[in-house]
């Protein structure tokens, strides 16, 4: 048994202790792997719960639905209008805490009403190294993080996902659309829609790991891996036309490249 198999076995032991679990499922790399493991371990005692908000891109909503159908797991949906939450809309540095608290409280209640007392999420070892106030909300609500408890890193999760033929094994890391707007700048539905449409257009050019950070509501700062900067320059005219058409007065490219949580630098 190799190291990955040992970690997966440990994950199954943890899930078995819960008996019945609901997985907070977004359709991303981590939650898809966790949902697969929960079903593999618990069968019908695994449930998926997806939170739907304006900060979740439409393609991810559709992807989550399709993955549940593929895995044969029952799914519940918890809708939340996050733009009605003052602590989300005003975008303070601890925005993620308030949003996660509301989302996971709702998903936990929904799961418990369906007979699943434990809600688990896809946090892993790598998530402990960045500024993540949302993890405090999970701890307060008693949300369990079995991937973290089993010592699984992002690389482990991708490797095991590939081993189990999960289509998300090489999917780019995702984050809610609100993470594209600098702290202190109000979040609106219009800004979230602009970012989503801009990123969808750029993804259509073949760019993979990318972010469109929206500064001041009208300056787009595009982040892509350095090796993909040439693609951006090749399509420069079309990118400028499209993003200005969406409402951006200025279209820029960050020469530092894609950086996870780059807006946390100012904290």
Model-derived regions: residue spans:
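Internal, active-site/partner-interface "lid" segment
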Residues: 171-191
């Amino acid at each position: 048994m190799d190291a990955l198999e040992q970690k997966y076995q440990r994950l199954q032991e943890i899930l078995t202790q819960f008996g019945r679990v609901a997985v907070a499922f977004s359709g991303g790399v981590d939650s898809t792997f966790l949902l697969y493991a929960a079903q593999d371990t618990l069968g019908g005692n695994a449930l998926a719960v997806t939170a739907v908000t304006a900060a979740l891109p439409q393609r991810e909503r559709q992807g989550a639905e399709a993955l549940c159908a593929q895995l044969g797991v029952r799914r519940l949906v918890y809708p939340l209008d996050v733009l009605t939450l003052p602590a989300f809309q005003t975008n303070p540095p601890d925005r993620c805490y308030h949003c996660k608290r509301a989302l996971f409280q709702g998903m936990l209640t929904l799961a418990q009403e369906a007979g699943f007392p434990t809600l688990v999420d896809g946090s892993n070892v790598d998530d402990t190294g960045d500024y993540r106030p949302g993890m405090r909300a999970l701890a307060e609500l008693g949300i369990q993080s079995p991937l973290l408890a089993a010592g699984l890193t992002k690389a482990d999760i991708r490797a095991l996902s590939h081993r189990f033929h999960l289509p998300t094994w090489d999917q780019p890391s995702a984050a809610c659309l609100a993470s594209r707007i600098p702290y202190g700048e109000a979040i609106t539905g219009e800004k979230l829609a602009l970012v989503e449409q801009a990123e969808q257009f750029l993804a259509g050019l073949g760019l993979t790991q990318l972010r469109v950070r929206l500064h001041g509501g009208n300056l787009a700062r595009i982040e892509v891996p350095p090796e993909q900067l040439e693609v951006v320059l090749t399509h420069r005219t079309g990118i400028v036309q499209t993003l200005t058409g969406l409402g951006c007065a200025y279209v820029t490219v960050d020469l530092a490249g894609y950086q996870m949580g780059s807006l946390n630098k100012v904290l």
